[in-house]
Design a protein with these regions (language model features):
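Metal-dependent DNA phosphodiester-chemistry modules and their immediately adjacent helices/loops
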Residues: 1-22, 154-157, 211-304
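Acidic, metal-coordinating catalytic cores used for nucleic-acid/nucleotide bond scission
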Residues: 194-203, 227-231
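Acidic, metal-ligating active-site segments
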Residues: 112-126, 284-288, 292-293
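Acidic, low-complexity intrinsically disordered tails
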Residues: 303-315
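Non-catalytic, compositionally simple segments
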Residues: 1-104, 113-115, 131-176
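Flexible, glycine/threonine-enriched loop-and-boundary segments that flank and lead into catalytic domains
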Residues: 76-107, 186-191, 195, 203-211, ...
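Short, surface-exposed connector motifs at secondary-structure boundaries
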Residues: 184-192, 216-221
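A short acidic (Asp/Glu
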Residues: 114-119, 201-210, 233-236
Length: 315
């Protein structure tokens, strides 16, 4: 029989230094007068807060089980809870609802024949913590009918529903993507666009930056690292906004699929996490696009929330 890890009464088995009164009334580490006994250091309030987050965030649950309760687990570090994700479907997001608003972009450019994602994050004018996500997803047309593509029926359905667009041929047409982003710059007040520092599309990024009026000192398109240090702030921010129910994705089914797929690498020293394509159970490009956009949002909020310097496109 395994104990219920959410039951406060059993926490003392793994945390003998627990101090406080459980929800059922059991007392640990306090004397008859209610004073803490010397040597009992783990406050039950802290455990309670971490347990609450663990219930809603799979990656936090794994961390809580292993580090707080000494429960060894083989589960992968799944990151986002789908029920919590669904609770962030707050209002419709369209070009019309975002027209003229300030945005922070993120591009996850495909290698050749995969998906390319262009995400824009729009902080609400009245509530900066409320962010609307506008996403555009492209796929090479040939991939819709490629029998080796196990997602082809999904893609075909999303194209019919207007959630996915295609470019002609077997490979993604970067000129189409760039032209669309330039067109968007006339509709929205784009502040910054983040792009994966490790990607191979230097020419794409350089041309886009030039066309958007970026400079070496003040780039419009900036390379962002995807490691623990660079992703610490964006990963924490996406979790915070989801828990506040303020990361409005408008019910986009592609983003929902990717949110369910994504897993993370957790720094064993406790210094953050980063998305892990290798262990994720499918495509996660849209989530990476959101993280790249959040990097720009955080930098606009001030240096305190930033963990890595922005880099002009200079590979």
């Amino acid at each position: 029989h395994e104990d219920d890890w959410t039951n406060e009464d059993v926490w003392v088995k793994a945390a003998p230094g627990l101090v406080g009164i459980t929800e059922s009334g059991k007392r640990f580490g306090i004397d008859k007068e209610g004073h803490p006994i010397p040597g009992y250091m783990t406050k039950i309030e802290d455990m309670r807060d971490k347990c609450r987050v663990a219930k809603q965030m799979p990656s936090a649950q794994n961390n809580f089980l292993t580090k707080r309760l000494n429960i060894w687990t083989q589960q992968e570090n799944r990151w986002l809870d789908l029920a919590l994700w669904d609770q962030n479907n707050i209002r419709p997001v369209t070009e019309e609802t975002c027209m003229g608003r300030m945005s922070y972009g993120g591009i996850d450019l495909s290698s050749v024949s995969d998906l390319t994602i262009w995400v824009q994050l729009f902080p609400d004018n009245d509530d900066p913590d409320l962010i609307d996500i506008l996403i555009r997803t492209w796929c090479p047309e040939a991939r819709l009918y490629d029998t080796k593509n196990k997602y082809r029926e999904q893609y075909q359905s999303w194209v019919k529903q207007g959630y996915m667009w295609t470019t002609e041929g077997d490979a993604i047409d970067e000129d189409v993507i760039r032209a669309h982003i330039i067109e968007d710059s006339g509709k929205f007040n784009i502040q910054r666009i983040g792009i994966d520092r490790g990607f191979q599309g230097y020419t794409f990024a350089r041309k886009l930056d030039e066309e958007l009026g970026g400079t070496e000192k003040d780039p419009m398109v900036a390379a962002v690292g995807m490691g623990w240090v660079s992703m610490m702030g964006p990963c924490q921010e996406i979790e915070r906004l989801l828990l506040l129910r303020k990361l409005n994705h408008g019910g986009n089914p592609i983003l929902r699929w990717m949110a369910d797929n994504v897993s993370v690498k957790i720094n064993p020293t406790g210094g953050g996490k980063s998305p892990n394509k290798a262990t994720s159970q499918g495509k996660i490009d849209g989530i990476i696009g959101i993280l790249l956009g959040l990097d720009g949002v955080l930098r606009n909020a001030g240096p305190v929330k930033v963990t890595d310097e922005y880099n002009a496109i200079a590979f």
